[in-house]
Amino acid sequence: MYTDFSKLRNIGISAHIDSGKTTLTERILFYTKRIHAIHEVKGKDGVGATMDSMELERERGITIASAATHCEWKGLHLNIIDTPGHVDFTIEVERSLRVLDGAILVLCSVAGVQSQSLTVDRQMRRYNVPRLAFVNKCDRSGANPIRVKDQLREKLQHNPVLMQLPIGLEDKFEGVVDLVKMKAFRFSGDDGEVITESEIPADMQADAARAREELLDAASMFSDELTDAILEDRVTEELIKAAVRKGTLALKLTPVFMGSAYKNKAVQKLLDGVVDYLPDPTEVVNEAHDLTKDEEKVALTIDNEKPTVALAFKLEDGRYGQLTYLRIYQGKLSRDMFITNMRTKKDHRIGRLVRMHSDQMEDIDAAGSGDIVAMFGVDCNSGDTFTDGTVKLNMTSMHVPEPVIALSIKPVDSKSETNMGKALRRFTREDPTFRAGLDEESGETIIRGMGELHLEVYIERMKREYNCIVEVSPPQVAYRETVSQRADFAYTHKKQTGGSGQFGRVCGYIEPCEQQFEFVDDVVGGAIPREFISAVEKGFRSMLAKGRLLGFPVVNTRVVINDGASHAVDSSDIAFQEAARGAWREGFDRAKPRLLEPIMRVVCEGPAEFSGGILGTLMQRRAMIIGSQDDGGLARIEAEVPLAEMFGYSTTLRSATQGKAEFSMEFSRYLPVPAAMAEELMTKASKKAEGGKK
């Protein structure tokens, strides 16, 4: 268990596909003596990279599932967390990024800043993750790390500063000039483990002096002490490092390193950069919501003696049951300790606590604040917060957005049917924005989520991880129904069946409101006896699940009851529930009901020369443009678009921009469906219903 938190780093490694992320991780593990032989992603030895533990990953040479590992470098403990590959819709992304304190953004020296680099960087910016850039593949034909540094400024709006210059490029790449030490470093030996320090080559001294001056200019913006030292010509390595670190942690500076992971060059210098410039857990602000004070935010302290607060950020089906990855934000965890799940309020005993190394694990007795570990034997969901029971804090707000899109899926055979149940159970535990259930009328399995891509990812995972193949129906939009004006109702439910009958009368009105549903009891004089008021409310609430237009849930509706009647013998809970249902039907039909559709906030980003084409694709889809901007050749267009118009949009956008633009989409609000479209939807629904009756 760590007590010197300055010696701890929690970092992520993110990149566009094929930028060399897994190869870089493999080298980091080798140089930190975590592994004792290097295996390539698509190596001839057939072993495959350490971090690619799934068979499918090793066959294809890509990383599918995320992995976590840890290693030591120069007395520091590094936890390396793989950031998720799909960064669009799931809550899991937010959790994974919350777990990181800093990150390495890997860029290809030839291709530079690519579309996925933009996406990854945007996510990190959203969660305030300080980062270093590593320009990889300097040995490749066409390598130009200086151009990539410029792209960081132009395309990502970073303030990049070179920490190194390359010694040679392409097949002549030998090493780097360290602009802080003003020394040359070359890497030799079978695996680049022999580092030779020497003077800067004569033909590079002028370039190195110029680049160091730029480094000092950029760093001095964050340190008056460094500014004074520059003027007095007494600059030290420590002053430069302290200033660059300050700028990096403030997200105002991006130190740029370079090398070739595949050719084993300069990875050790990047590790030095992680130590020097990325934050330890005490330098990052983490907050929790106090459940005793209406989810008020409270700051957490990296302190092993404080009450324990930990977040389950990833679940895996391990060989010994569910494996839960945890980040400890405050306090400590130990084996056999009892912890409380803040969502379920249940206590659990930690049966086994481990450190992960890809798919291998090492048992430990305890872990402290700021650390990342995994536990077995605790039943939980991804995103659950655990405490030691002395505090009621939650790491994430309890609010989970409602799904906006649904698909019906059907397994192709009995084997797929068995596996589908297992897959859906696991996915709904991992991701609260993903829902699955049975449609009572059709008997079909319906999955719901935050967008097309969100559901596509899970259908693909079913196939890959559970060998479950399903047929997918066209997507369905999660419409809602509401009323648009006030309407009165006065309904009497009367039933005589011999013996005691049923009687209940309910009067009042229905009207639009801001809340999902509001029930107001304005009955005076005992017209409806008090003991039946809750039955009346229950009757009204039972009608909310299915509206009377197309059977979608009803929202933004207030029901006020102000009169009624009862019978001494025939009135009962059941009678008043039925009276309320009849009153609802009467009032709802008179209150001009209408359909609401989900409106998505869509952000499109691509080269400025395609901005006209991007606008065109949006305007064809009933979009309302909110704003557009052009940042250094990168156009960003923000719009609100009905979800019903967004199906297949990725293909349209790709063809309109030669595949150079991308978009993200999130739910914004519900708005009324235009009258003509609502009419069309209802006509389709009635035809479908008639077809079903035949």
Curated annotation (Swiss-Prot):
CDD domains: EF-G (cd01886), EFG_III (cd16262), EFG_mtEFG1_IV (cd01434), mtEFG1_II_like (cd04091). The keyword Protein biosynthesis applies. The keyword Transferase does not apply. Belongs to the TRAFAC class translation factor GTPase superfamily. Classic translation factor GTPase family. EF-G/EF-2 subfamily. PANTHER family: ELONGATION FACTOR G, MITOCHONDRIAL. NCBIfam families: EF-G, PRK12740.1-5, small_GTP. HAMAP family: EF_G_EF_2_B. This is Elongation factor G 2.
